[in-house]
Each structure stands twice: as C-alpha cells, then as structure tokens.
Amino acid sequence: PALILVGVILLFSKGIDLQPGDSAPDFALTDESGVEHRLSDYLGKPVVVYFYPKDDTPGCTKEACAFRDDNPLFEELGVRVFGISYDSPKSHRRFKSKYDIPFTLLSDSDKTVAKSYGAAGLIFPKRVTFIIDEEGKISKVYEKVSVTTHSREILDFLGTRTELLD
C-alpha cells in the first residue's frame, strides 16, 4: 500500500515547467486582509513568489521567519515578497500575527496559481520559489529549498552580500 501511495504521489508531482526568461503567469489572489493583489500591479520592481505547504507548520514557520528577519534587506532592494499557500486568509492572518510576519501572504485556495506555476502538489503546494524581474520575467527558480537559508540564498542572487550581515 505504501509503495502504491508513493507511486500515485510521483505520478501527480510534475516538475516545474517555467524557466528563467519565461513570462511569469499573472495572478490575482487575496491576502490575509482580504485585499486582492495582481502580479501585474508590481511590474517595475522585482518580486519573490514563494510557495509553501501550510501555515504554522515547522518548516514553513522557519522559512517565513527567515524571510521576516531579512525583510529589511528585501525592502532596501525594492523587492516585494509574496508567500503563497492553499490556506485561507483567516489562517494567514493568524500565522502573520503569531510570528510578526511583515510581508504579504496570499491565499490560493483553489490551487489555480500553484498549477500555473507548476507548484501544485497533491495535498499541499510544493516548496518552490520564483524570482520575477521588473519586466515580469522569471529570473530564477528554486526547486530545492533549505527553509533556514533560503532567504539569504535569494538575497545573494539579488546581489546582497549577506555574509557581511552575520
């Protein structure tokens, strides 16, 4: 039975089709306060879109808190950070409040955006990150993520010398 389950999961776990240079799929999702955000509204500035499985779970909390701690550096660079999961705006509100998360969390409850980015998993979104440039093109895709160091890895890619900050 376990082998069958693994096979079914692998069958539905398709890789990421989007690559650097591709146009990032536009989306309109609601944040924790009920405000709609469209990716196209942020053209002209770089955007980090990170998909994560679930609010207030150990790995997702570590990842969100790392982004939280580095948020001043993202702001300094003019980079907008969006975390996306299938959780409801209410769940996002609790998660943000509990961990003092300063950036926007978006609700993809119908999995449409995760599917368009190739980040949809069978039950939860895959942990994957896209860096989108000022023109709306994907500049980097992270399919393998270390929750504790991922934020710094992105800052390094964006040109911040994070080793000087520790």
Stretches found by the model and what they are:
Residues 51-69, 73:
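Conserved redox-active cysteine motifs that mediate thiol-disulfide chemistry
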Residues 82, 93-128:
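Short, internal strand/loop/helix patches
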Residues 1-30, 166:
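N-terminal targeting signals for export/organelle localization
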Residues 28-47:
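A short beta-strand-turn-helix
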Residues 125-166:
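Thiol-/selenol-based redox modules, centered on thioredoxin-like
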Residues 48-49, 81:
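Hydrophobic beta-strand anchors of alpha/beta hydrolase catalytic cores
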